[in-house]
């Protein structure tokens, strides 16, 4: 299912679920991943407000970057919408970069870019989406189903702030044919 931003969409905070919600105006409601304790006071006290042109532009910018990874359209929409919520409504976070190896490959990623990091303890590479770019650290959302860290488990779209020197550009794996190396 592919969703398209619409001027009928409305943001609101649902106190029963303690989350920012987006009424998609077609009988569907999107519930963000982020609990009230992670959100700004503005998000928690907001009245219903429209999904703005800036929100739509950000949604499409995020979605454009996802073309390089193989995930279902429903998950793309979920990641993009959670990215918009993270950018607009999340409280600032402190970096938690000790989980990841330093590379100094990237000085500053692009908003929405799919990046990879390498786990310090086992060398596994993990995909994230950059929701908000900072000068030295960026807020990222997990762009795969699950990540087991030494002291916690992250799920799809969970946020973490990572120092930019830990981020690497994601390079899509290439498929070689059996004749790919023939000279």
From Swiss-Prot:
It is found in: Cytoplasm. Signal peptide: none annotated. InterPro entries: ZapC (IPR009809), ZapC_C (IPR048372), ZapC_N (IPR048373). Its main location: cytoplasm. One of its GO terms (cellular component) is cytoplasm. It holds the Pfam family ZapC_C. Keywords: Cell cycle, Cell division, Cytoplasm, Septation. GO terms for biological process: division septum assembly; FtsZ-dependent cytokinesis. It comes from the Bacteria. Contributes to the efficiency of the cell division process by stabilizing the polymeric form of the cell division protein FtsZ. Acts by promoting interactions between FtsZ protofilaments and suppressing the GTPase activity of FtsZ. Belongs to the ZapC family. Interacts directly with FtsZ. This is Cell division protein ZapC. It comes from Xenorhabdus bovienii (strain SS-2004). The gene is zapC.
């Amino acid at each position: 299912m592919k969703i398209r931003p619409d001027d009928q969409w409305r943001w609101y905070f649902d106190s029963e679920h303690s989350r920012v919600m987006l009424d998609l105006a077609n009988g569907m409601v999107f519930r963000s991943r982020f609990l009230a304790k992670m959100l700004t006071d503005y998000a928690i006290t907001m009245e219903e407000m429209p999904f703005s042109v800036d929100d739509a532009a950000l949604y499409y910018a995020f979605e454009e970057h996802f073309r390089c990874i193989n995930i279902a359209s429903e998950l793309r929409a979920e990641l993009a919408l959670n990215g918009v919520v993270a950018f607009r409504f999340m409280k600032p976070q402190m970096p938690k970069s000790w989980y990841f190896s330093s590379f100094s490959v990237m000085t500053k990623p692009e908003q929405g870019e799919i990046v990879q990091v390498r786990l310090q303890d086992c060398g596994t590479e993990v995909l994230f989406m950059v929701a908000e770019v900072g000068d030295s650290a960026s807020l990222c959302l997990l762009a795969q189903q699950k990540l087991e860290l030494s002291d916690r488990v992250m799920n799809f779209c969970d946020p973490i702030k990572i120092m930019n020197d830990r981020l690497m550009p994601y390079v899509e794996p290439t498929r070689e044919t059996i004749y790919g190396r023939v000279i």
